[in-house]
């Protein structure tokens, strides 16, 4: 008797779950973005958001072991950020790259592995690096822009002092550290759900 092929088509219930958990992710990431008022926290913000959002992302991966989760979550979150005026072309680029890579990892691992869903979450979390990334990408023009927008001189000066290569490395590492903490925190709190889904 041939093995039954699992149904990987998203149902109405799946889409509702994706919508709900995407909204929760947006709220948590939006709260994290307020950390940008403190320069050093803006640098590590992608990692902090990963810690905060590990539960909704990983629980959604448990509930919907099908393709489309990172892409749809990224699309919904991106639209919400666009509506609130918080979206830039850099964030758009990092979000798209992070979502696509996350989707590929889940697809290659057949959706049911905690380890690979954690990797997918880390890649997804790199989408938020688009917020502090202009500090290094555009540097002088970026600092001129935020000064023209009315940011205090002390804030701009502090940001300039943080725009070093070592701090860039720190920023790049934060989604990995935060993603691991967020994923294991989610599994620790909702162990029964992960065990039932075979993600232990």
Question: Where are each of the predicted segments found?
Answer:
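Aromatic-anchored segments of alpha-helical transmembrane domains
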Residues: 22-30, 76-84, 123-133
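Hydrophobic transmembrane alpha-helices
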Residues: 2-68, 72
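Membrane-embedded alpha-helical hairpins and interfacial helices in multi-pass inner-membrane proteins
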Residues: 118-191
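Membrane topogenic helices and adjacent juxtamembrane segments
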Residues: 1-33, 146-155, 162-170, 187, ...
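Interfacial aromatic-anchored transmembrane helix boundaries in multi-pass membrane proteins
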Residues: 34-42, 77-104
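Hydrophobic alpha-helical transmembrane segments
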Residues: 15-19, 47-48, 70-75, 89-96, ...
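Short helix-perturbing small/polar motifs within transmembrane alpha-helices
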Residues: 27, 94-133, 183
């Amino acid at each position: 008797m041939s093995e039954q092929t699992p149904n990987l088509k998203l149902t109405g219930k799946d889409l509702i779950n994706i919508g709900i958990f995407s909204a929760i992710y947006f709220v948590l990431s939006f709260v994290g973005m307020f950390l940008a008022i403190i320069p050093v926290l803006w640098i590590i913000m992608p990692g902090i958001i990963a810690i905060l959002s590990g539960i909704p992302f990983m629980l959604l991966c448990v509930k919907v072991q099908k393709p489309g989760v990172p892409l749809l979550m990224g699309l919904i979150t991106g639209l919400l950020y666009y509506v609130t005026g918080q979206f830039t072309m850099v964030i758009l680029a990092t979000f798209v790259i992070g979502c696509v890579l996350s989707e590929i990892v889940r697809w290659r691992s057949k959706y049911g592995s905690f380890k690979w869903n954690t990797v997918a979450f880390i890649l997804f979390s790199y989408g938020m690096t688009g917020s502090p990334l202009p500090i290094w990408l555009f540097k002088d023009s970026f600092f001129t822009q935020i000064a023209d927008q009315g940011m205090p001189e002390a804030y701009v000066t502090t940001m300039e002092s943080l725009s070093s290569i070592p701090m860039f490395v720190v920023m790049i590492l934060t989604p990995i550290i935060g993603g691991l903490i967020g994923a294991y925190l989610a599994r620790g709190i909702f162990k029964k759900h992960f065990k039932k889904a075979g993600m232990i």
